[in-house]
């Protein structure tokens, strides 16, 4: 057995490392002595849990003063002890639990269903205390950031940076060091064991800081994370043949545009700002913008303006860049990261923004072009299934109506009136302007932003905003009330008890934060109802105000209608209704694809 010592907050702590089967007796005694609660963590070969090459190397358990590290990479005898230990623990504390639970499930068959009820996730606690990332004035939510805040900046710097140090020493990258470092390298073992000691200490500091008003959110957010981890695990079936064909087509098209840029305009590389700037200036374009290093600036805004003015080189460059980006970041990535069963796996972060809106990586559903079917066509339903989508009807505007109690807005929804036309008529502008103004109230933005978005003058934009306030006075009252609350307290609190910090210089954002946070909770409450009704195995993506599912073809219409019924919610006087839609085999069929 290896024994490592380290000092934390004036305490000498111990990391014990199992080397042989004989060492397991000491580990078992440690588990027996701490059955009520232990911090748990894993060390793996990387982050791609569902790839064929992914492995779990170490599993570690710890208190605030002692940790045990088990080298599961060495085989079944060690894995079995870990399996027994995890089964015996009444409570487990983890940082970013979804990742480690999926590791234990995928690598050792320890099903998450039996683990989640016993889990306390320090990352969830941290986000309930302060949802802001470090860059936005919060203390952050990574373990390194939490160590810096609640234990010591030196500890965060020294121990959590060990792997970066080892990568540099071994002349490799931080991404590769996890799989290549010797299993018993003392600094690797110290890093692993200390993670659980740090997590246990961070948990002790965080728990009393969760505001009383937010306490009920602790089990609620754990349930949301649990459901999302099951969606992650399930994966979304990829049509590999179509995806490869699309990637090849986009590459060929990109090369054609690049060839035209070279032969017609002498631009060798459209992705080279200098080459492109040279070509544009030879056409008579004056580039006034400069980068921080003094070079000519050719950014998206300039290209958009030039394309609008009919500049062919700008259009060619824009198209080539777009095809390259879409191919690499979307389609080729789907192909490269799919698992052995041709599934791509999401990694859903249910508490990402300061308003708690979800984010998704793996399948970047939230960043795909809103009406495009070509990329979505890559994903298909299970054999014998079809794709279905259920989205909310004007979710955020209905939430705004419910929160504000504005009679005009409520009656508009009750009577099926056109809210966008009402705003437009009040300001004597086209419906498009009224629609943009309505959504700006949801997302925030002043007259200048409205003017730029729809191409009107600032005086007209101000008139539209004034017309909105006059038409929906309840919204204006709510906005002022929330801004005052934010100015007084530095935060507002939504109906679920979630504290939302608001910067003192941006108290006008309080309404936007309240709407986004409340809308997110409408979707999350729906996820819980769907889970309780047994629909989770069929769910593929939660996308803000929409749920995408793979449903048996023979039951799809009925099931989609039932999902829609479960998702809808009565918020006071306003029904936040849903629109179920059933497509064909591919996700893209819901956007116009013929398959």
UniProtKB/Swiss-Prot annotation:
Organism: Mycobacterium phage L5 (Mycobacteriophage L5)
Start and end residues of each 3'-5' exonuclease domain: 1-212
The name this protein goes by in its record: DNA polymerase
UniProt xrefs under InterPro entries: 3'-5'_exonuclease_dom, DNA-dir_DNA_pol_A_CS, DNA-dir_DNA_pol_A_palm_dom, DNA/RNA_pol_sf, DNA_polymerase_A, RNaseH-like_sf, RNaseH_sf
Taxonomy of the source species: Viruses, Duplodnaviria, Heunggongvirae, Uroviricota, Caudoviricetes
Any one GO biological process: viral DNA genome replication
Database matches in Pfam families: DNA_pol_A, DNA_pol_A_exo1
EC number in record: 2.7.7.7, 3.1.11.-
PANTHER family: DNA POLYMERASE I, DNA POLYMERASE NU
Catalytic activity: DNA(n) + a 2'-deoxyribonucleoside 5'-triphosphate = DNA(n+1) + diphosphate
Family under the similarity heading: Belongs to the DNA polymerase type-A family.
Source organism, top-level taxon: Viruses
Main function: Replicates viral genomic DNA. This polymerase possesses two enzymatic activities: DNA synthesis (polymerase) and an exonucleolytic activity that degrades single-stranded DNA in the 3'-5' direction.
Alphabetized UniProt keyword annotations: DNA replication, DNA-binding, DNA-directed DNA polymerase, Exonuclease, Hydrolase, Nuclease, Nucleotidyltransferase, Transferase, Viral DNA replication
Annotated region described as Polymerase, given as residue ranges: 213-595
GO molecular function: 3'-5' exonuclease activity; DNA binding; DNA-directed DNA polymerase activity
């Amino acid at each position: 057995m290896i024994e490592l010592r380290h000092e934390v907050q004036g305490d000498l702590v111990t990391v014990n490392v199992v080397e042989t089967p004989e060492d397991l007796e000491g580990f078992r005694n440690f588990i027996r002595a701490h059955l009520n609660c232990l911090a748990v963590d894993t060390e793996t070969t990387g982050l791609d849990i569902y790839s064929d090459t992914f492995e779990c190397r170490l599993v570690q358990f710890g208190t605030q003063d002692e940790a045990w590290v088990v080298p599961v990479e060495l085989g079944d005898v060690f894995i079995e002890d870990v399996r027994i230990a995890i089964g015996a623990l009444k409570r487990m504390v983890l940082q970013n639990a979804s990742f480690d639970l999926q590791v234990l499930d995928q690598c050792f068959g320890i099903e998450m269903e039996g683990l989640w009820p016993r889990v306390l996730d320090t990352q969830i606690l941290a986000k309930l205390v302060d949802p802001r990332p470090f860059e936005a004035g919060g203390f952050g939510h990574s373990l390194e950031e939490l160590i810096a805040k609640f234990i010591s900046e030196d500890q965060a710097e020294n121990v959590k940076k060990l792997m970066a140090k080892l990568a540099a020493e071994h002349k490799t990258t931080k991404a590769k060091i996890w799989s290549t470092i010797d299993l018993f390298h003392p600094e690797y073992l110290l890093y692993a064991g200390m993670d659980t000691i740090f997590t246990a200490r961070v948990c002790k500091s965080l728990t009393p800081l969760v505001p009383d008003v937010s306490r009920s959110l602790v089990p609620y957010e754990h349930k949301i994370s649990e459901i999302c981890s099951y969606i992650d695990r399930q994966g979304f079936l990829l049509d590999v043949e179509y995806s490869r064909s699309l990637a090849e087509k986009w590459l060929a098209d990109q090369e054609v545009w690049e060839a035209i840029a070279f032969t017609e305009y002498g631009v060798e590389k459209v992705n080279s700002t200098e080459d492109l700037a040279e070509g544009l200036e030879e056409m008579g374009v004056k580039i006034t913008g400069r980068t921080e290093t003094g070079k000519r600036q050719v950014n998206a805004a300039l290209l958009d303006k030039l394309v609008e003015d009919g500049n062919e080189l700008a259009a060619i460059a824009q198209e080539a860049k777009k095809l390259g980006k879409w191919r690499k970041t979307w389609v080729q990535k789907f192909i490269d990261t799919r698992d052995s069963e041709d599934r791509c796996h999401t990694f859903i972060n249910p508490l990402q923004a300061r308003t708690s809106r979800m984010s998704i990586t793996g399948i970047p559903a939230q960043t795909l072009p809103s009406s495009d079917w070509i990329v979505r066509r890559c994903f298909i339903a299970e054999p014998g299934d079809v794709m279905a989508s259920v989205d909310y009807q004007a979710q955020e505007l209905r939430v705004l109506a419910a929160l504000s109690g504005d009679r005009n807005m409520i009656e508009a929804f009750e009577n099926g009136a056109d809210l966008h036309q009402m705003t437009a008529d009040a300001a004597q502008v086209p419906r498009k302007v009224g629609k943009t103004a309505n959504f700006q109230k949801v997302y925030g933005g002043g007259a200048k932003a409205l003017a730029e978005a729809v191409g009107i003058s600032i005086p007209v934009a101000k008139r539209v905003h004034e017309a909105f306030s006059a038409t929906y006075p309840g919204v204006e009252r709510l906005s002022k009330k929330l801004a005052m609350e934010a100015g007084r307290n530095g935060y507002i609190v939504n109906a679920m008890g979630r504290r939302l910090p608001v910067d003192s210089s941006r108290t006008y954002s309080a309404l936007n934060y309240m709407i986004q946070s409340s809308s997110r909770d409408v979707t999350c409450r729906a996820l819980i109802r769907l889970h309780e009704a047994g629909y989770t195995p069929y769910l593929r993506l939660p996308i803000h105000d929409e749920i995408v599912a793979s449903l048996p073809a023979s039951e799809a219409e009925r099931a989609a209608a039932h999902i829609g019924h479960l998702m809808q919610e009565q918020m006071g006087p306003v029904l936040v209704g849903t629109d179920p839609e059933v497509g064909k085999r591919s996700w893209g069929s819901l956007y116009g694809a013929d398959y």
